[in-house]
Amino acid sequence: ASDGRNAAADDKASDPIALTVRGGCCSHPVCYTKNPNCGGRR
């Protein structure tokens, strides 16, 4: 039962984290610089 809960938690966490990296990360200069998905260097 605990394995199932962990898997479900991981699945639910993955989507918001991915969205946060795409949106929020690109708003932070340090993360923006390291993330090519944000559009590369300015």
From Swiss-Prot:
Q: Which residues cross the membrane?
A: none
Q: Which InterPro entries match?
A: Conotoxin_a-typ (IPR009958)
Q: Which residues form the propeptide?
A: 1-22
Which Pfam family is an annotated match for this chain, by its short name? Toxin_8
Residues bearing Glycine amide are G39
Q: List the disulfide bonds.
A: C25-C31, C26-C38
The cellular location(s) given in this protein's UniProt record come to: Secreted
Keywords, A to Z, come to:
Acetylcholine receptor inhibiting toxin, Amidation, Disulfide bond, Neurotoxin, Postsynaptic neurotoxin, Secreted, Toxin
* Cellular component GO terms held in the UniProt record: extracellular region; host cell postsynaptic membrane
Does the record carry Ribonucleoprotein as a key word?
Answer: no
Instruction: List, in alphabetical order, the Gene Ontology terms for molecular function in this entry.
Output: acetylcholine receptor inhibitor activity; toxin activity
State the domain notes. Answer: The cysteine framework is I (CC-C-C). Alpha4/6 pattern.
* Purpose of the protein: Alpha-conotoxins act on postsynaptic membranes, they bind to the nicotinic acetylcholine receptors (nAChR) and thus inhibit them. This toxin potently and selectively inhibits human and rat alpha-6-beta-4/CHRNA6-CHRNB4 nAChR (IC(50)=12 nM on rat nAChR). It exhibits rapid binding and unbinding at this receptor.
Q: What else is known?
A: Negative results: has no effect on human alpha-1-beta-1-delta-epsilon/CHRNA1-CHRNB1-CHRNE-CHRND, rat alpha-2-beta-2/CHRNA2-CHRNB2, rat alpha-2 beta-4/CHRNA2-CHRNB4, rat alpha-3 beta-2/CHRNA3-CHRNB2, rat alpha-4 beta-2/CHRNA4-CHRNB2, rat alpha-4 beta-4/CHRNA4-CHRNB4, rat alpha-7/CHRNA7, rat alpha-9-alpha-10/CHRNA9-CHRNA10, human alpha-3-beta-4/CHRNA3-CHRNB4, human alpha-6/alpha-3-beta-2-beta-3 (CHRNA6/CHRNA3, CHRNB2 and CHRNB3), human alpha-4-beta-2/CHRNA4-CHRNB2.
Q: What is this protein called?
A: Alpha-conotoxin VnIB
| Species of the source | Conus ventricosus
